[in-house]
Regions:
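Bacterial N-terminal signal peptides
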Residues: 8-17
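Extracellular beta-sheet/turn segments enriched in Thr/Pro/Gly and aliphatic residues
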Residues: 23-27, 101-119
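Structural motif
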Residues: 35-46
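Hydrophobic beta-strand segments
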Residues: 44, 49-55, 85
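Short, acidic Ser/Thr/Gly-rich low-complexity loop/linker segments typical of extracellular
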Residues: 57-71
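A short, solvent-exposed beta-strand micro-motif common in secreted/extracellular proteins
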Residues: 70, 81-91
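Short, flexible loop/turn segments at beta-strand junctions in immunoglobulin-like
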Residues: 74-77
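Edge beta-strands of extracellular beta-sandwich domains
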Residues: 94-101
Length: 119
């Protein structure tokens, strides 16, 4: 009888563990990514440009320094929030781009052009 109780307990634990993993992967698949490139006026990748991403619901701001190819990436974003994205480098600034919660794409790709003077 003890053996059977242990077996039932083990099966219950395994079922619970599998359901938790499935829920986590489902939640992960619902998250969104914003990625892209920062370029200067001449369309050259702007290495070291700082990209700012602001969650308009929480006002939380995340930043990312563009790599040697001007690339940036923000992942794990809430699909139910709106965001503003812009880049800055050495006194230049890009236009602020909007990412809407109504846009159902899981991955948003942007080109941020540094063409304005920073305020």
């Amino acid at each position: 009888m003890k053996r059977r109780a242990w077996f039932v307990l083990l099966v219950a634990i395994l079922i619970f563990a599998v359901s938790v993993v499935a829920q986590d992967s489902k939640k992960e698949s619902q998250l969104r990514t914003v990625r892209g490139v920062v370029v200067d006026k001449g369309e050259t990748p702007a290495q070291g440009g700082v990209v700012f991403l602001k969650n308009l619901r929480t006002n939380q701001v995340r930043s990312y320094i563009a790599d040697s190819e001007g690339l940036f990436r923000f992942s794990g974003l809430d699909p139910n929030a709106d965001y503003e994205v812009h880049a800055e480098k050495e006194g230049a600034k890009s236009q602020t781009r909007q990412v809407s919660s109504f846009d159902n794409r899981k991955e948003i790709v942007l080109t941020l052009k540094l063409d304005k003077k920073k305020d």
